[in-house]
Amino acid sequence: MKYSQNQIVYVIFFFIILIVVKPIESVEWSDCSDPSDSFKIEKLEFSPEQPIAGQDLIISVSGYLNKEITKGEAYLAITFDRIPILKLKGNLCDGMGVTCPIPQGNYSTTTINQEIPENVPQGYYYVNFVLYDQDDLQITCVDVQMNITQS
């Protein structure tokens, strides 16, 4: 059987995609902050590494804050399999395990527990999380990708 050059190129392209584009097996994150943002993330960890519906996701963050935060807002956007499903805006200093004012300097917390609802569909979730300070200046920005499974 003879293959055309186009068929060979498509097969090679398909295998390259399989090798390069790996499925998300744990929580992955990237820093989408601007260089001028006041919080520089040094470490962001999630436990468990494989989020499971009906269980808590514990988030640990540490970094350096170059100015005091007296108040602020948090913005959260969640996408499920590329479909936007939720956008939230909230008070940074109320209900997030954070107490304001937050002093300038090294910052570390392991108190962020997020329950993943038991009925959440299994699949790939993309989260964009942006914080703003009392002057409406961006504090930091994080993009998170995770594959939530059922227990």
From Swiss-Prot:
The keyword Signal applies. InterPro entries: Ig_E-set (IPR014756), ML_dom (IPR003172), NPC2-like (IPR039670). One of its GO terms (biological process) is sterol transport. It comes from the Eukaryota. GO terms for molecular function: sterol binding. The keyword Cytoplasm does not apply. Keywords: Lipid transport, Signal, Transport. Catalyzes the intermembrane transfer of phosphatidylglycerol and phosphatidylinositol. PANTHER family: COUNTIN-3-RELATED, NIEMANN PICK TYPE C2 PROTEIN NPC2-RELATED. Monomer. Belongs to the NPC2 family. This is Putative phosphatidylglycerol/phosphatidylinositol transfer protein 3. It comes from Dictyostelium discoideum.
